[in-house]
Amino acid sequence: MSQDAFVAWARAHAIPISIPGTDESYDDLRFLDAWLDEKRILLVGESAHYLHEWNRWRARLFKYLALHHGYTTFVLECGLVEGRLVHDYVAGADTQWNEIARAINNVWGVWAEINELIRWMREWNARPDRPFELRFYPMDGTANWTHAGRAYEAVHAFAARVDPALAEDMEAWLAGGVAEVSLADRTEVSDARYCDLIGAASLVVSRIEQARLAYTAASSYDDYDWSLRAAQILRDVLMAIAQTEADFEVGVRQLWNVRDVSM
């Protein structure tokens, strides 16, 4: 299809939308009803992180889907390791708001529209008469893929609870190396050191997977799932940084390719 043909098709099929400043009515989104039908997952393409209109429309869309179509879960492109705080806050955990805003990385946390939606979800869950619980999940890695420190901390804290021997092994194998490795200093780490660290992180993932029943019994299903994913992210961040060339114009594509596969 030529560019002109696409433009003609898009103009003929475009649906005007409005972005009201209040949520008194959602009539502007009623056009979605026939199209949604019985669909249970809705993917919304990203136009930009930094536009009020985009963030406002997406927040209103999720509210409408929850209120009128029974949607329960909002997934955002922000760090999974840090974002567990947000997940727990929406579920009712008593956490200071400043910590929540900082936990929403990829620049989402600074936008009032996202903040307001998270508070709205928490308020929904606090209602005794709510029809179902709303949940927030982050889908990215950690620290904008610049270091693995927070992932290490999350996994080590879990290991200390469920298997002190694993926590001790992590300290011996990974603590110093994780502190050394960052995107900015990636060329100062040898290939052999990267191989050792990635191998150690992979072994941690394997041990968590093998001990699923014991670790779940010592914690919870949720704690186990979050911690396993954090361990996988720890490994993947190390791999991503190791594969990022010194010439960042080339390396940035390598970094984001590994990151996108990991997500």
Which residue stretches match the model-derived regions?
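Structured catalytic-domain cores with a bias toward divalent-metal coordination
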Residues: M1-M263
